[in-house]
Swiss-Prot record:
SUPFAM superfamilies to which the protein is assigned, alphabetical: TolB, N-terminal domain (SSF52964), Tricorn protease N-terminal domain (SSF69304)
Signal sequence range: 1-26
SS bond partners: none
HAMAP family listed in its UniProt record: TolB (MF_00671)
Cited function: Part of the Tol-Pal system, which plays a role in outer membrane invagination during cell division and is important for maintaining outer membrane integrity.
UniProt protein name: Tol-Pal system protein TolB
Length: 431
C-alpha cells in the first residue's frame, strides 16, 4: 500500500515537506503589509508610566496596526499622554492623524498592572471609548494585542485578530516542534517536541486545545493537547493510519481520516476518543475533512472522480445525503478550508506544475488564485476571515506566508530565522 493510500493526499505532502530542511533557533516574525491601497492614519502616544516595563504596550499596539497593512502610524512624539489628559484633537488632525490613542499603565505591585486607554476620532472630534485591562509581566503583550483589536474594530468595523494565536511545526536538526505563538509570531512556546514528524495541527473552537497527528509511535496517531494544563491524550489510534483531525464547531466531535478498512475514509469521533462512526462510504481515498462554520456540512478531498477534488456531505455522513462535488476549476484540488462566515472556500490547486492557493466563492462558484507562490499548502483562515495563512516555499526554503483572502495584495513571506517551518493553523478568537 502506497503512502498516499495510507495517509491521504495532504498527509503525504505534509510529511515530505516537513522533513525537508531544518531550523536552528527558528522564530517566526509575522509581517502582513500592503494589504490595501488606502491606509488609516493613526497616532498612538506613549502611555504614561511605561518606563521600566518588560514590554512596552504602545510598541506592541503600533506594531500590530502596521503589520495589518490597514494602518499608517503617525509620529506621536515621545511625550506620554495619559487617557485623562485634555487632548487637542484638531492639532492631531492637522498632523495627519485621523485617530489618536492615549493611555496609561498603573503599577499595582507584585508585577500587576492596570492599563487604561482611550481612542479618539479626530475627524469627528469625539471619543470612541476605551478599555481598562488587568495584566502582569507575562500578559503585557496580550494586553497590547487586545488594545490593537479594539482599535481595529472601532475604526474598520471588523473584529481584529491580534490577540489570536498561531500553531505551526518547526524542524530543528532531527527534532520536530509543535509551537504556539502570538499572532505576530512572538512569545512562542513549545507544545510538543519529538524526533518523529508532527503534522495537521487544528485548533479547537475554544482556542484552548490543539489536535494534531504525531508519528512518535512509528505510525500516525491523533492526539489532543490541552494548552492550559499541558495534558495530552490520544483521540484516535485505530488500526492503520489516523490523520487529518478537524473540530466540529461545538468542540464535541472531530472528523478524522482513517485507513481502518483499507482506503482512507472519513470518520467522526468524540473529543474524548469514543463514539467512532464512519461517515464516507466510498472505495476511493476520502481525506482532509473540514466542518462548515454552522456545523451542517463536512468538506473533504476525494479522488472518487478519478483525481483529487473537493466534495461536501452532510455532517452526519453520506448516509444522510450524497456527497456533492464543489470544485470544478482545475483537475487536482485538495486541502479545503471554509471561511468563518461560511462564504469562501480556500484550497490548494495543482496548476502549471506547481501548487497554488485558490479561493472560491461558495455561492457563485467563482474561483481565483490569490498567490504568486508555487508550492502552497495548508491554508488557514484568520478568525475574522480577512487573511489566510499558508505554507509555501521561497528561495528554496520552507516558509509561512499570509495573504488577504480577497487577493487584494500579494502574499507576504513570514520571516523565519534560519529554518524550516510548516503546518500553520490560525487560532480562533479567544473566549
Amino acid at each position: 500500500m502506497s503512502l498516499m493510500t495510507k495517509l491521504g493526499f495532504r498527509a503525504l505532502v505534509a510529511s515530505c515537506l516537513i522533513a525537508a530542511g531544518s531550523a536552528a533557533n527558528a522564530q517566526v516574525n509575522v509581517l502582513i503589509t500592503g494589504v490595501g491601497s488606502t491606509q488609516f492614519p493613526i497616532a498612538t502616544a506613549n502611555f504614561a508610566n511605561e518606563a521600566g516595563l518588560p514590554q512596552q504596550v504602545t510598541s506592541i499596539v503600533r506594531a500590530d496596526l502596521a503589520r495589518s497593512g490597514k494602518f499608517t502610524n503617525i509620529d506621536a512624539g515621545s511625550t506620554p499622554v495619559p487617557e485623562t489628559a485634555s487632548v487637542d484633537l484638531g492639532a492631531w488632525k492637522a498632523k495627519g492623524a485621523n485617530a489618536f490613542v492615549a493611555g496609561s499603565v498603573n503599577h499595582e505591585g507584585n508585577g500587576q498592572y492596570k492599563i487604561n486607554f482611550i481612542l479618539y476620532d479626530t475627524v469627528k472630534q469625539q471619543s470612541l471609548g476605551g478599555l481598562s485591562l488587568s495584566a502582569n509581566d507575562t500578559t503585557l503583550r496580550t494586553a497590547g494585542h487586545k488594545i490593537a483589536d479594539y482599535i481595529y474594530q472601532k475604526l474598520l468595523g471588523v473584529r481584529g485578530v491580534f490577540a489570536t494565536r498561531l500553531s505551526y511545526v518547526i524542524k530543528t536538526g532531527n527534532r520536530y516542534q509543535l509551537q504556539i505563538s502570538d499572532s505576530d509570531g512572538q512569545n512562542a512556546r513549545i507544545a510538543l517536541s519529538s524526533t518523529e514528524p508532527i503534522i495537521s495541527p487544528a485548533w479547537s473552537p475554544s482556542g484552548t486545545k490543539v489536535a494534531y497527528v504525531s508519528f512518535e509511535r512509528k505510525k500516525p496517531i491523533v492526539y489532543i493537547h490541552d494548552l492550559p494544563t499541558g495534558r495530552r491524550y490520544m483521540v484516535s489510534d485505530q488500526k492503520g493510519n489516523n490523520s487529518a483531525p478537524a473540530w466540529s464547531p461545538d468542540g464535541n466531535t472531530l472528523a478524522v481520516a482513517l485507513s481502518l478498512t483499507g482506503n482512507t475514509q472519513i470518520y467522526s469521533v468524540n473529543s474524548n476518543g469514543g463514539g467512532l462512526r464512519r461517515l464516507t462510504q466510498s472505495s476511493s481515498i476520502d481525506t482532509e475533512p473540514f466542518y462548515s462554520p454552522d456545523g451542517r456540512w463536512i468538506y473533504f478531498t476525494s479522488d472518487r472522480g478519478g483525481a483529487p477534488q473537493i466534495y461536501r456531505m452532510p455532517a452526519q455522513g453520506e448516509s444522510a445525503g450524497a456527497a456533492q462535488r464543489v470544485t470544478f476549476t482545475g483537475s487536482y484540488n485538495t486541502s479545503p478550508r471554509v471561511s468563518p462566515d461560511g462564504k469562501l472556500l480556500a484550497y490548494i490547486s495543482r496548476t502549471g506544475g506547481g501548487f497554488k492557493l485558490y479561493v472560491q466563492d461558495l455561492q457563485t462558484g467563482a474561483a481565483n488564485a490569490i498567490t504568486n507562490t508555487n508550492r502552497d499548502e495548508s491554508p488557514s483562515f484568520a478568525a475574522n476571515g480577512q487573511y489566510i495563512l499558508y505554507a509555501t516555499q521561497s528561495g528554496g526554503r520552507n516558509v509561512l506566508a499570509a495573504v488577504p483572502s480577497d487577493g487584494s495584495a500579494p502574499p507576504q513571506i513570514l520571516s523565519v530565522q534560519g529554518g524550516s517551518v510548516r503546518e500553520p493553523s490560525w487560532g480562533p478568537f479567544m473566549q
